[in-house]
Amino acid sequence: MIRVEGLRKQLTGEFTLAVDELVIEDGERVALIGMNGSGKSTLLKLIAGEWAPDEGRILCDGSAATIGYQPQSPFCFRGTVEKNIRLGMRDEAIDLDALLADCGLTELKQKKVSDLSGGERQRMCFARMLAGNWPCLLLDEPLSAVDIRTSRSLEGALVHRCEEQGTTLLMSTHLPAQAMAVSTKILLMDAGRVIEYTDTADFLHPQSEFGKEFIAQWEIRK
């Protein structure tokens, strides 16, 4: 379980992230959504321990060693796709070939990272995170450079593995269909605040005025 209490983080300018209370139960898959600059990446960095809060606390069952975090621009090691993914494996029992197939990387297994396109590189980093079998995954726009068809396949692989392993997921995305596909709950942010936090099935009927406006924009973008 992840519990956030009285969290505050002042960034440059006037932006302050302020989350009074947030609880993410074990095994939940939470899609983190909102406009650019709403605080999604900031919240992920704080939970991941990349940044320290100015106030408040974040409580996680287990330790930082149980959390896998992928930022928007993840680091890639030199060498092949296979080497990169193996470096992310915490358990040698992982079926690497099955994971490569799930992520559409079988044909790229021996390709050098330097020769990959942006979308291929992002798929590789995504597969590397799945290879870790983390109890908790924090993913910041992990499929933003991937085409829609490939994204649908990767979303399915993510959900399947999370359900199979009981993984807790917190993933930011700007795509409505993706948020609905991967999540059991949706967290909507604006100006560093949590506006809505509800079951995915109920999100299309928001309580707040901002939520209603946001949903209307989503409908236009579908």
Task: Tell what function each PLM region has.
Residues 73-83, 87:
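Conserved catalytic motifs of ABC-family nucleotide-binding domains
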Residues 191-192:
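Conserved ABC ATPase "signature" C-loop
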Residues 112-116, 120:
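Conserved ABC ATPase signature
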Residues 201-222:
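C-terminal boundary and immediately downstream tail of ABC-type ATPase nucleotide-binding domains
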Residues 93-108:
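Conserved ABC ATPase "signature" region
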Residues 48:
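Helix-to-loop junction immediately C-terminal to a conserved catalytic motif
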Residues 173-174:
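H-loop/switch region of ABC-family ATPase nucleotide-binding domains
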